[in-house]
Amino acid sequence: RKDGSPFVTHPLAVAQIVAEELHLDSESIVAALLHDTIEDTEATHEQLAKLFSPTIADLVEGVSKLTRVHYTSKEEEQMENLRKMLMAMSKDIRVILIKISDRLHNMRTMEYQTPEKQKQKSFETMEIYAPIAHRLGMQKMKWELEDLSLKYLDPVGYREITEALDEKAAEYDGFMSAVHDRIVTRLREEGIEATVYGRMKHPYSIYRKMYTQNKSLDDVFDLFAFRVIVDTVADCYNVLGI
């Protein structure tokens, strides 16, 4: 690999993402380990089916087919068509999940690629893979794919936002903790049991607000998001009314 590590580190890392972050089954983990074999070696679908299983061979072949698809246009309509095509090609949803895991690890190690390759892969990730992750409900992966893409598409903007957030981390943590406690207390006063989560919005989300609305970070007021989880639909509506 470009970073000097053995090639096997990549399939191992992809398999780890599939196992630990997506919690997929053993067939998916094995397929993730083998996902580059048809593309990069002389191994065939038939050999993989015989050595492992037909299902694993199908998964690996499916990932290989997705790998050979590249965008040719920056037009939104064409991008949408490509997203639909990738989803349609993935007859088994695990194929696209493995491919997204593959892309995520490649983006995590993108610093070793040329600037041209960094921008090309980042644009492709931002326009194709992050939206697909969103459609599949994989929000944490979507956010990370977007942030990693922004890092190479606009290094200056990315650095300004992350450095500003780091500088104010203690202040923001204190604010979020206070808001969390206030929400929990208010709900208890109403007799509603709930689980409350708070998080800082991720850099790309903040970047979009800053650069599409021409605002500074200090002018972006919705930097935080809170999630309130209750047991019943009735409680949900009660919370909305508080």
Annotated model-derived regions:
Residues R1-L223, V230-I242:
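Active-site helical microenvironments for divalent-metal-assisted chemistry
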